[in-house]
Amino acid sequence: DARIEHVKKQITPFPSFASALKALGIDYGNLIESDLRKKGCGPKDNPWGHFEKLLNKEIKVDSAVYNSSLPTYRISWEGQTSNVRERLITLSRFELESDVIEHFIDDVESDILSNPYLISEWCARNFIEKVSTRTIDLGAFPDPTIQGDNVPVPPFAAESILDTRRLRSLVVERLYSVLTDGDTLVSIKEMEDYLRDIMTEEDKARLLRLCS
């Protein structure tokens, strides 16, 4: 479908870049991202490299309201461990609010670098409905029409809708969904039927895209 392809071309591979900056305590994240776009950061580029250039004065934005804060931002960024920086970059691949990103910056025991579906599991347990397994799919499945040259790679990437990490996330979502509805027990058969229905639905959607 041409409309789907058009939408994909407009999607950045790092949709929560500005939210990640906010989680780090950096103000004006949306403005910084907008200025970086104007200074050569394309829609499929990784904005984090451009952000470092801004901090190092390799990119200059005249009269920007945040210019006086850039030295402080640089200290904050360079003061983070490589693990925290990598987690921030990873988290920015998904459509997340800054409070969710902040949680996973602090929760260094959560191995989101190997299993990004831990994010949707945690959100399900905390009834954060804006983030689902499918939210993570968009950043975990390699798709050059969305991510350009920044496609995810193993062990982070998901290669199949049957990825066990993904299936576990779907199961956790279902369990907490029925809990909200007042049910406390779900049979194995009910869960199998639920997963089978999802897989069938996704297979049909994929076939329609291939035929359109």
Segments from the language model and where they lie:
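Helicase P-loop NTPase motor core of nucleic-acid translocases
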Residues: 1-212
